[in-house]
Amino acid sequence: MKEIGGYIQLDTYTGEMLHEEGILLNSGRNCLLYLAEAKHINKIRLPYFLCDSVYNSCVNAGIKVKFYHVDMNFMPEEPQKLDDDEWLYIVDYYGQLSDECIASLKQKYNRIVLDYTQSYFRKPLNGVDTMYTCRKFFGVTDGAVLYSDTKLERELETDESYSRMEFLLGRYERAASDFYPEYVNNNKLFAKMPVRKMSRLTYNLLHAINYDMTGKRRENNFNVLASLLGALNGIDVNSVIGPFAYPLYVEDGAELRKYLISNKIYIPLLWPNVIKDMPDDSVEYLSLIHISEPTRH
């Protein structure tokens, strides 16, 4: 029975939500696990240049994993052949993959999973299993979207987010550094989080966002950085819709990151596991060390 009265709750927002027509889940890695269960994926080829949480999720689910490399422009070095029941996991790093490249990969391998974690404002391509992560772009603690022609037959529980909101609410009124430990703890929770439907709280907050304004602001910031830093950049970077970040490749990228952090400009180190796992002359290692992301917002 629904409770009535007592005290006021959070307002219900009614704006349009980007990707509302997809399968709404609680995390990006759980999009992959949902897809693996629905499509009976037992083998997958992952890029070395990737968060180890994806690999760990696959291993824990009993999925056999092989790896492949990417080049300096984040393009996949395509395997000559996949096993008959193997899937290829493609990451659209910084939104740099073209629709033509994705379509070509789909035609060549058929069984591909497209990771749009860094490309929330891109539309999915028809017939390509595609996943998006909400918290990489917006002020929510969780949430992800999957596009697929196959759905699970079993009913999923709905996630709850209220207990994970402190670092977001705290940063709104105080310094980000005051709540960084809570942010880190929230990230750790995803490792053991089962596949669930997106929480009602996250779903509601995603209806409060002006996606057109947010996307254009990101594009403006990206274009300003490209005009100022493009001549210094060691890689070619294409303009994209609603970009995740501007990737700047410079030889002293690690020192630049330290300098920016010392001036309270926080440059994340994506996937530090790559530094531990890859040789220091590999493309993946060099990309992680030398790429700074001057702004995301």
Put a short name on every predicted segment.
Residues 1-18, 177-195:
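N-terminal "arm"/small-domain region of PLP-dependent enzymes with the aminotransferase-like
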Residues 4-22, 26, 33-107, 111, ...:
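PLP-dependent aminotransferase-like
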Residues 127-169, 174:
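Active-site PLP attachment segment
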Residues 147, 247-251:
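Short hydrophobic/aromatic beta-strand micro-patches
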Residues 197-226, 235-248:
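Conserved glycine-rich beta-strand-loop-beta hairpin in the small C-terminal domain of fold type I
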Residues 238-239, 253-287:
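Conserved PLP cofactor-binding pocket of PLP-dependent enzymes
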Residues 289-295:
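Conserved small/polar residues in nucleotide/adenosyl-binding loops
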